[in-house]
């Protein structure tokens, strides 16, 4: 007898059910898998909603979260720069001492990736030079 994994049907209403507070009773064994499927559905929904994620590109969950954070912060900056809210925002910043300029996480990760690649290239150059020094 072969082992098989259950086929899960794609449900578009999973988020709607959660927002309405509708709960189904599940056996304790099914709950971890159900939770995993719900989390994957949530990541898929986030990927659809954030405009900076290319729709046909495969991205990790970490990248999705980074894009979501960037998107939320960009929306906050846009909202904060709205003319009617600027005075309220400045009043709030003077109380908490905040700063509105920021570097997106995706840009920081790109910079780190570039530095990592440069370090690998540099170490390979040193290795090549050390080989030529040894007879």
UniProtKB/Swiss-Prot annotation:
Principal subcellular localization: cytoplasm
Motif (Nuclear export signal): 108-117
GO BP term, example: positive regulation of smooth muscle cell proliferation
Entry-linked SUPFAM superfamilies: HLH, helix-loop-helix DNA-binding domain
Gene Ontology molecular function terms on file: bHLH transcription factor binding; protein dimerization activity; transcription corepressor activity
Residue ranges crossing the lipid bilayer per the database entry: none
Annotated ranges, domain bHLH: 23-75
Keyword Hydrolase in record: no
UniProt keyword list: Biological rhythms, Cytoplasm, Developmental protein, Nucleus, Repressor, Transcription, Transcription regulation
Compartments where found: Cytoplasm; Nucleus
Family matches, as InterPro entries: bHLH_dom, DNA-bd_prot-inh, HLH_DNA-bd_sf
CC per GO annotation: cytoplasm; nucleus; protein-containing complex
Cytoplasm as UniProt keyword: yes
Subunit record text: Heterodimer with other HLH proteins.
Its job: Transcriptional regulator (lacking a basic DNA binding domain) which negatively regulates the basic helix-loop-helix (bHLH) transcription factors by forming heterodimers and inhibiting their DNA binding and transcriptional activity. Inhibits the activity of both neurogenic (neurod1/neuroD) and myogenic (myod1/myoD) bHLH factors. May play a role in the regulation of the circadian clock.
Protein known as: DNA-binding protein inhibitor ID-2-B
Lineage, opening ranks: Eukaryota, Metazoa, Chordata, Craniata, Vertebrata
């Amino acid at each position: 007898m072969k082992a098989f994994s259950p086929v899960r049907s794609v449900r578009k209403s999973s988020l709607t059910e959660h927002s309405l507070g509708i709960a189904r009773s599940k056996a304790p064994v099914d709950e971890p898998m159900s939770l995993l499927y719900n989390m994957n559905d949530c990541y898929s929904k986030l990927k659809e909603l954030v405009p900076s994620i290319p729709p046909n590109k495969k991205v990790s969950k970490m990248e999705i979260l980074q894009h979501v954070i960037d998107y939320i912060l960009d929306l906050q900056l846009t909202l904060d720069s709205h003319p009617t809210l600027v005075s309220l925002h400045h009043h709030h910043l003077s109380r908490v001492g905040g700063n509105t300029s920021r570097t997106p996480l995706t840009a920081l990760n790109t910079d780190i990736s570039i530095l990592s690649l440069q370090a690998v290239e540099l170490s390979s150059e040193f290795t090549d030079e050390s080989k030529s020094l040894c007879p």
